[in-house]
Amino acid sequence: MSNWICFYEESNYDDVYDFYLNLSKASDAYNLKILEPEWVKLKNKSSAKDWIKKADEFLYEGQNDYSFAIFYLGKNDYIYPQLKKHSLCNNGYISQVVKARSVNKKGALSVCSKILLQINAKLGGISYKAVVDKDVEKLKIMAIGVDSSHTSKRTGVAMIATINDSYTDFYNKEDIIEEENKSQLQFCVSSFIEEAIQAYKNKNKEIPKSIIIYRQGVSLQQKTFLKEEIKQIEEVCKTKNILFYYILVNTKTTFKFFEKYEDEENEGEEYYCNPESGLLILDGVTNRNYFEFYIQPQYVTEGSATPTCFHVAYGNLNNPEMIPKFTFDLCHIYSNWQGTVRIPNVIKAAEKLSKMTAKYKLGELNEELKEGQAYL
């Protein structure tokens, strides 16, 4: 890994160099070699404007084509939102904002490993990819994750779509809906899907044959909203002859599932424990009037595992039996985590981006960053 740049304040030089050494050590596990960056020093107590001005000088106005930048923040980590927003939305360069208090503590190597995962994803590297069945491959599926995060004043909506057959390349968009305009929320997804279909076509020279939409941030009780959002999506897909599923994702379920075992060494005494990763529940506790299922994607060693509920609110694909396995496969390939997560990678990424959008009031992503995962 070379041709990168690191910004820091002069009083933090020793700490930032230790961080670089730890990053280099952590990279051994990935068989990477990290060359030393170009160091750019700022005065102590520099404002967010000073950081942005210096960053633009090197990354936007300069002649060097740096692959990415790290901003190392000491006690001034309150400027994190401004740096994140500027790099993602204004001038569109790939960056990693590092808070000193996160890396200067026990477990620094572990933190650096996670940072390397993020950097790898931001630069387009593939840590994991899904290998789907041939029958699924023929469907040319585009998976989409949509999440809404709410504050008292606004709603942040993020939409992430896969645009390759291993579900590891993405087209992204986020939007801010102010409280007084919240009725516009139901039209966001359909307009995004049109853009995502075009991005898929640009990359693959054809449009997807089917779309699976994972929707979080909306409940079954919001029937009017759901009906209108699905209607808008249906109109877009119908004009392009694309079949789709619209699946509500609920991680806040009250059910717990356990596996029963018999202890042969103790006269067959029964005991219960968390299920292995991949538990699928299709009946018994599901809604009989709808296609609904529960998946326990992770194996939990402490406490009790909470499954995720997937409720199919609409679908016109002819093979619904492939949906649970496809969903479980996507839980394995979230770029920002080593292992499985509770929800498919597209919805996990949308969850992260929607929270950032609502909290930091992000504008539209820079055109250069609408594909990829620069927001991680």
Model-derived regions, located:
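Long, low-complexity, intrinsically disordered terminal regions
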Residues: 1-376
